[in-house]
C-alpha cells in the first residue's frame, strides 16, 4: 500500500493527498518507511486514524480508496470515489473503478460529472435490497443464525 501511495502522490502532484491508516491496521507499517514516504512526497499528509471519516470526507475534493468502506461513506456525502479494490460498490455508475494507477488519468470526465441526490438515494436503495439481516464480526447465536439463513437463501435462488 505504501508503494501505491508513493505512485499516487507522484501521479497527481502538486495536489495534496491525505491518507488515513485503517483502524484495524494501526501501526502495521514501519515508521521508517512512512517517514521516507513523507520526505519523498511533499504533497502527502497523514491523518490521525482516530479522526472520524465523515469529517475528512466532507472536506475532500474526491476520495481514492483501495478497498474501504470510506468509499461507501463518501457516496453518502455526494463525493466522487475512485476505487482500485474489490469493493461491493465498485460497479456502480457513481464510482470510477480502476484496475491500475494508469487508468486514473482517464478520470477527468467522471470527476466533472455532478452526482444528484436521486442517484445517491437509488444507490443506497439498491444496496439495501441486496443486503441481509446481520452484523459483520458479530458472533452471537442470533447473528450466526441470520448469516446461515442468508447463505441458504442465496443458494436456493441459484
Stretches found by the model and what they are:
Residues 14, 62, 87-90, 110-114:
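Short, well-ordered loop/turn and helix-capping segments at boundaries between secondary-structure elements
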Residues 15-17, 81, 114-119:
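Hydrophobic anchor at the start of a short beta-strand
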Residues 48-96:
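A donor-sugar binding/catalytic signature common to diverse glycosyltransferases
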Amino acid at each position: 500500500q505504501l508503494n501505491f501511495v508513493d505512485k499516487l502522490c507522484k501521479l497527481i502532484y502538486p495536489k495534496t493527498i491525505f491518507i488515513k491508516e485503517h483502524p484495524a491496521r494501526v501501526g502495521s507499517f514501519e515508521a521508517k518507511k512512512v517517514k521516507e514516504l513523507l520526505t519523498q512526497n511533499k504533497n502527502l499528509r497523514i491523518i490521525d486514524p482516530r479522526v472520524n471519516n465523515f469529517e475528512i470526507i466532507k472536506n475532500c475534493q474526491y476520495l481514492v480508496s483501495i478497498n474501504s468502506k470510506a468509499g461507501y461513506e463518501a457516496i453518502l456525502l455526494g463525493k466522487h470515489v475512485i476505487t482500485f479494490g474489490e469493493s461491493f460498490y465498485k460497479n456502480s455508475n457513481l464510482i470510477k473503478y480502476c484496475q491500475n494507477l494508469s487508468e486514473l488519468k482517464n478520470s477527468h470526465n467522471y470527476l466533472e460529472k455532478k452526482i444528484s441526490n436521486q442517484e445517491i438515494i437509488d444507490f443506497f436503495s439498491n444496496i439495501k435490497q441486496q443486503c441481509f439481516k446481520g452484523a459483520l464480526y458479530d458472533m452471537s447465536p442470533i447473528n450466526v443464525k441470520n448469516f446461515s439463513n442468508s447463505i441458504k437463501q442465496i443458494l436456493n435462488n441459484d
